[in-house]
């Protein structure tokens, strides 16, 4: 048993029926059959667990893209599919925290992945680092906007 993963899975299950602000540590530990001490050993609060889930998802996505060897179009589709599949989680977080904070947090996680894709697509082109950064932000914000709208 991996307690962190079990706690994360419990939170994701609860998010299917409740909003984040209505979910308590008691709900999470009851769902996965551990005690509160176990929760607090790994996380400060429910929001800390949510941040860990987003970090884990972004890292898994980045690893998947790095190892796939696919072209940048497929990589963008992969990111879109992942964001769509986690939409309930993102939207629950969106309703529970400030939109700007959530966007900033998601940009930290997904922004570098998008940047890598943009860099790959720009190989051989005469573009500045500023242009690459602009295009990366444009695509990242567009993808996130599609999730929020």
What name fits each language-model region?
Residues 16-20, 33-50:
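HTH DNA-binding helix-turn interface
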Residues 7, 26-31, 39, 83:
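Append "Primarily bacterial transcriptional regulators
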Residues 3-11, 28, 53-57:
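Generic hydrophobic, amphipathic alpha-helix propensity
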Residues 13-16, 23, 53-78, 90-92:
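Amphipathic alpha-helical linker/stalk segments
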Residues 88-95, 99:
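Contiguous segments within soluble domain cores/interaction surfaces
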Residues 1-18, 22-23:
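Basic, helix-initiating cap at the start of DNA-binding domains
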Residues 77-78, 99-124, 130-145:
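Amphipathic alpha-helical packing segments from all-alpha helical-bundle domains
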Residues 56-61, 86, 90, 113-121:
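A short secondary-structure junction motif
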């Amino acid at each position: 048993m991996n307690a962190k993963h079990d706690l994360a899975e419990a939170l994701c299950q609860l998010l299917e029926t409740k909003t984040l602000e209505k979910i308590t540590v008691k709900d999470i530990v009851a769902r996965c059959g551990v005690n509160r001490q176990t929760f607090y050993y790994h996380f400060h609060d429910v929001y800390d667990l949510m941040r860990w889930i987003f970090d884990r998802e972004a890292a898994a996505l980045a690893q998947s893209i790095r190892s796939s060897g696919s072209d940048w179009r497929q990589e963008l589709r992969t990111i879109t599919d992942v964001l769509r599949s986690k939409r309930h989680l993102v939207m629950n977080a969106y309703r529970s925290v400030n939109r700007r904070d959530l966007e900033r947090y998601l940009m930290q996680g997904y922004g570098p992945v998008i940047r890598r894709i943009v860099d790959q697509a720009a190989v051989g082109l005469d573009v500045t680092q500023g242009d690459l950064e602009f295009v990366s932000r444009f695509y990242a914000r567009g993808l996130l906007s599609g999730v929020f709208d």
